[in-house]
Amino acid sequence: MLAIFNIYLDNAFHLNGIILAKLPEAYAIFDPIVDVMPIIPVFFFLLAFVWQASVSFR
């Protein structure tokens, strides 16, 4: 069990490095878009509540 947890932690640390990596210089113009992209699914989640409120939570 402990070995599985250690593997999980090792993978989590490696993924953090990938997420925080910078884009290559050629794609630097897309930095603002890439910064907003992880938030887009949250907007869809909130849109579901707005939609339900507009139809009175049927």
Curated annotation (Swiss-Prot):
UniProt keyword Chloroplast present? yes
Quick one: where is this thing mainly located?
A: plastid
Q: Where in the cell is it found?
A: Plastid, Chloroplast thylakoid membrane
Q: How does it sit in the membrane?
A: Single-pass membrane protein
Provide the function of this protein. One of the components of the core complex of photosystem II (PSII). PSII is a light-driven water:plastoquinone oxidoreductase that uses light energy to abstract electrons from H(2)O, generating O(2) and a proton gradient subsequently used for ATP formation. It consists of a core antenna complex that captures photons, and an electron transfer chain that converts photonic excitation into a charge separation.
Family in the record: Belongs to the PsbK family.
Q: How does it assemble?
A: PSII is composed of 1 copy each of membrane proteins PsbA, PsbB, PsbC, PsbD, PsbE, PsbF, PsbH, PsbI, PsbJ, PsbK, PsbL, PsbM, PsbT, PsbX, PsbY, PsbZ, Psb30/Ycf12, at least 3 peripheral proteins of the oxygen-evolving complex and a large number of cofactors. It forms dimeric complexes.
Q: What is this protein called?
A: Photosystem II reaction center protein K
What species is given as this protein's source? Answer: Physcomitrium patens
Q: Which gene encodes it?
A: psbK
